[in-house]
């Protein structure tokens, strides 16, 4: 070590009053100054490329500390630190000491002593105290004869026994989609929170936003009943569980719903790196989920610009479990591969997957089923078994009440299309399908569409998810009224990630949205029956999900590879398809140059439209597509000889559809 460096180190020790070996102090100086951050990041990225591996944030921090010399080196990465870099770091620290001696001294002291303080052990003890007497995973296995009332009442009873931010899995065996849908929606609207200040400050605006949307809808009569329904809906924040995933077995007999419990908890959470409760907690990564920022000036994790460590309860617990390295937390690689997609094959491993993927070693698991079983120790978890609650009547959710009131006030005035093309085998109209359907002469025996997804495309922007559902409700009601009495409506939709903006309009409302189940609710309110749900397996889709190779609880999440194709009917009918998993690729709309060769952002394939053919009972009647888009439904009708009607609101897409149909 050069004389200049030694001199500066001595000066640091004199100013701070810290007496530490130079070989121990220098790595701390380098770490706090962050002069090597970019070079270390580049080195780690090169290491990942060479070895074709992925690293978690904890693993990157471990390597960084080794390269800086803070901890004993275990990797083979070569990394030399020059005297110039050391001098630069020392100059930055000395400059910082001149400006804020107390703050910088505290950071150096904390960094030097962090190794001797076993905060991980302390924090693990703290977590165990918080979770004592509670479950960290709830699994409910629903047999065919178990009613939705029993399931919902059981969920309500077990809710308070489940630790916050932890998971619930519901396994359905030969259960109809109608029941699954009702249970899922009840899970998200289980309770009401009245003390969430971020919502309380904007309640008036949220009520006004929805009221204005309803008032401006020409197909809805806004009256006192809707005013009262809006007031009731926004009487607090609906909460309970947040939807994560829906697994479907490839034989369609088994489905698995995954939810995470999220409720408001304002309890101060100590910093995981210094155990200080001197924290700030005014941030919410998700609605009702609070995060904190450490304000301890001596915390070893303070950033170069003085920001404290940011953290929330579940991320701290997961990182701590990862650091502890308990082998019981290692997920079997073959098991992770088997559930890599949300369409799976082997139902024999469901219990193992749920317990090892959605809980940690040492957690308590509550397993509800109709079968009586004894307590077991399973993959390092304590598993207790229980039965169902009685099937008391379940009240409608506030969402159901709101949408039902909207439906009661739908009054559509027919109007002529802006332009139209009518041929022997098809007709296409430009305008709003709700208003045009009352004017067209064609009789409709069936309908099929892929509706605009809530805020998933540039042409489908609604202020909130509720506003989107209102529009879809009105259009579905108009189609129900126009269809013949034995009419069928095939509806293709997938669950997406997006900001629902229902209670808070910001990034914190970003989550997985159950568009499929919300659509089922709409159709059920109108009077449709769910005949079947064909699962469109889109194969290997691109996804950031499950990109980790860390086979560790809550890191392993499935790739969403399917969409729903619901078959709704006006009268109860027997299903037409014995095989309900449909495999065909999505439309390729982008060429090798990155150009959109179809001109539409969300075209759907001809193979999907062909699924409607068995439901066409009268070949003199027409098949409707109320959201025609690029014209695929009409093109398919021409090719396979059935009559079609297409309606498109967007004039640009109407022109695109017209051109494609003429060229087909």
Residue ranges of predicted features:
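Core catalytic lobe of class I
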Residues: 1-655
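C-terminal helical cap(s) of enzyme catalytic domains, especially alpha/beta-barrels
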Residues: 654, 658-664
